Amino acid sequence: MFITFEGIDGSGKTTQSKLLANHFKQIRGENNVVLTREPGGTNFAEKVRGVLLTNNIDSISELLLLISMRREHMKKLILPALAEGKIVICDRFIDSTIAYQGYGFGVDLRLIRDLHKLVEIKYPDITFILDIDVKVGLNRAKDKNKYEEMDVNFYNKVRKGFQEIAIKEPVRCSVITGIETKNDNHVHNEIIDKIT
């Protein structure tokens, strides 16, 4: 099973990814669950991550780097783990690229999808989109990088992107709303209820 967590910065993706991984490790065993992230997940991608998050590069160049990193991530980590019957949980994946690069920066959505098809990216089985008020999310965000320096209008576009993805793909995507009014355990229990 391949599960991803999506949402704007400060929505709690990293926390919920870790909580779900720990939940499955208790059930399936430590070695049967893989927790990973994007950008990142492989040695190559982790090196490029620092460049992406701290440098302002052209939006198409950034898209191509993200897709290259994702292909490497799929081939070296995600697909082998899934082939071994492991549960893979990823903090961000393809939907973040669509929301941030497409909706936020205005890169053509068709181009983003076509490039992912070209490099044979597998979509997750389940995606949890953690929906939070933009201002609250930005106040909660822990990692300060170039994206946190973007204005509220940018994040409103990104949030709208995630919401539209969920509308277009209701079987794969499950939206957890009102994150700003719930504690981490409440959100985690909501996620567990949706999986079982």
From Swiss-Prot:
GO biological process: dTDP biosynthetic process; dTTP biosynthetic process; dUDP biosynthetic process
Reactions performed catalytically: dTMP + ATP = dTDP + ADP
Residues that coordinate or bind ATP: G7, I8, D9, G10, S11, G12, K13, T14
ATP-binding as UniProt keyword: yes
Any GO CC annotation of this UniProt entry: cytosol
This protein's UniProt keywords: ATP-binding, Kinase, Nucleotide biosynthesis, Nucleotide-binding, Transferase
Pfam families named in the record: Thymidylate_kin
EC id: 2.7.4.9
UniProt cross-references to InterPro entries, sorted A to Z: P-loop_NTPase, Thymidylate_kin-like_dom, Thymidylate_kin_CS, Thymidylate_kinase
GO molecular function annotations of the record: ATP binding; dTMP kinase activity
Family of the protein in this entry: Belongs to the thymidylate kinase family.
Function: Phosphorylation of dTMP to form dTDP in both de novo and salvage pathways of dTTP synthesis.
Name the UniProt record assigns to this protein: Thymidylate kinase
Organism: Wolbachia pipientis wMel
